[in-house]
Amino acid sequence: MGESDLSFTKLFEFRNEDDAIFHNVVELVKDKLSKNLKLNVNEALLVYCAHIVSEIRSNNTESEIANNSSKILTRDNVLIGVPESLREITFNITLDNFPKKIIKYTEPIPTVNYIMVDSKTNGS
């Protein structure tokens, strides 16, 4: 019997004056994705964080934001092990003048058989 999964906490915290830095880092990660390079855990978390910030500023609800999580990244966008590390992600967000929101993603990157599937032979 293996050990149970251990959760970890990653804190993204920035003030308004850090907004430009946040957006520059997000653009660097998006550039990496556009070159078909795979993201590590920290980069994947940043993508989800940026998505949430954008969705909150568009006045979307917590459930609308959470329901779109499976469309953000796929197993082909991330390194092996990232989907397992991010089986459940909870963001506690206080942004601008919006009330605090709690966004929870459950298995945002599907893990079912992703190591066993060869995208070249599957046509993906």
Language-model regions, residue ranges each:
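Non-transmembrane, aqueous-exposed alpha-helical and coiled segments at domain scale
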Residues: 1-123
